[in-house]
Amino acid sequence: MTESESMVYRVVPKCACSSIGQIMFYSDHGRYFDGDIHDATSGLHKWNQPESQPLIEANVAAHKALTFTCVRNPYARILSSFFDKICGIQRNGRRYRGNLVPMLVQKYGIEVGGPDGKQPFDQIASFRRFLLFARDTIRWRRPMEPDIHWSAVSGHVATFIVNGGRYDQILFTEKFDEGMQKVLDAAPT
């Protein structure tokens, strides 16, 4: 939620959340956050900040602000998850979730381009193996619970409704500019 409480956004991982966070930050402060918006500890109200939770709850209960979320084609979302979270090196210089990638290499035969992610590898074969892993996590909760980056979008979106929220807008990453413009046009700031 913006500090001005003009917009409430339900985050859905791998659905333009960084871009949306930066736009919301800009709408209140006239500048973008210097760094990764996920690392911001001020300038936005976030659910993971205990002091923000009562403000978000009250705003959502009274439906005081424009409330929106963003969804994405499931194939594009899981492909993005694969390249970002499995093949990529994270902001901290390490692999995502520590031992997850080594386990995928061992149990599923996934290749990720070597320790630095820069070596050539069969991306199609590895992605197909990753899909088997993602299916196993979703269907059987093995070898782990589904990760937020590839669990169903509907689960993320529905938690807001179940907890009393109501969306004014749902935009699509595939039509991001158009959808975000509608959100900004409808928001008071």
Task: Give, region by region, the residue ranges found by the protein language model.
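Membrane-interface amphipathic segments in extracytoplasmic regions
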Residues: 1-189
